[in-house]
Amino acid sequence: GVYFKLITDKLRTKADADLKAHGLTMTQSRVLCFLSDHNGEATQKEIEEFLSVTHPTVVGIVSRLEQNGFITFHPDSADKRNKIVVLTEKAVQVDKEMKEIIRRQDKKLFASLSEEQVKELTFLLQTIYENLNTEEEDTPC
């Protein structure tokens, strides 16, 4: 567990510095990445579900993204009550830059590992993640 914490802290510090240079928080960058992975647009409800947060929280996040020129809104033609959140060209460019930073960081992370070791590590980490997501049985202790 200690190494997970140490690695997470190092990665978060690096990511925060990279994001700060673009005027973004980690959560805001996750929203931009989500939108990028969904053809540049999604409803606020879809963003709520992705982040597992409340509607007011998403309203605050997307409001700041709009103020900083990363997104715009347009009405949902299928349901006028919904607003579609859309990436701006500025956000598309920042997303490309962030993905390149992540690619370089991944290369650095795995530089001393063989391809086979990277595959094994990936498998082990996925297994640990799945173990954490399974419901725990009630134990008497």
Where are these regions (language model features)?
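Short capping segments at the starts of secondary-structure elements
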Residues: 38-43
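C-terminal regulatory/oligomerization modules of transcriptional regulators
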Residues: 116-141
